[in-house]
Amino acid sequence: MRFRALILSLAACIIALGLSSSSFAQTKADTINKALVKTHATLSKRYNRVSHIDAQALSKMDEDSYIIFDVREKDEFEVSHIENSIWVDPSIDASSFNAQYSDQIGDKTLVLYCSVGVRSSRLAQKLEKTRPETETSPIYNLENGVFGWHNESRPLVSETASTHYVHPYNRLWGRMVNRKNLRRYEPEEK
């Protein structure tokens, strides 16, 4: 029930995108970014055990010091993803995740992302709850997810090359992507 309340609250933020139109004060991008900030605030309260990292801080980290996981559906990942990210099924449980990826992670910082942070925060919290006390490497959710990354014009890749497209998840959530013409439900043709 609490998850449903979270989704309804986040949907209200998205719907507000279409309703707020101050002719002189806000651009569409400002409105979208404010919706992402509001969504992040809601997620931070809901998943209060999860630490977050923003795109700027992540881009300054040594690439060998972290491992990044994309916690979206496979079709979203195929359209685009952050370079070197590893796809993870959003429904994976913590023990399966640890069994499958613990050797790759080692002592590296773990970064998870999805569209805006719902699915990745959920997985990050599961991992935090079940991790042994001996493991001290940080687990982060990427603040504002791949939508925030994309809105800041940071690089994305597909299976074949770099791309400017991002999967919008659905029409409602996709309204948080600044450039409508760069939303795409299918990967680019090879």
Where are these regions (language model features)?
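Bacterial N-terminal signal peptides that target proteins for export
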Residues: M1-L10
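Short hydrophobic beta-strand that contains or immediately precedes a catalytic carboxylate
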Residues: I67-R72
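Loop/turn elements at helix/coil->beta-strand transitions in domains of secreted/extracellular proteins
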Residues: D64-Y66, G106-T109
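Gly/Ser/Thr-rich loops at beta-strand to alpha-helix junctions
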Residues: S115-S120
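A short acidic-Thr-Gly-centered motif at the start of a beta-strand
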Residues: A55-D64
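Bacterial N-terminal signal peptides
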Residues: S9-S20
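Rhodanese-like catalytic fold shared by cysteine-dependent sulfurtransferases
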Residues: R2, F24-S51, E78-D107, S121-K190
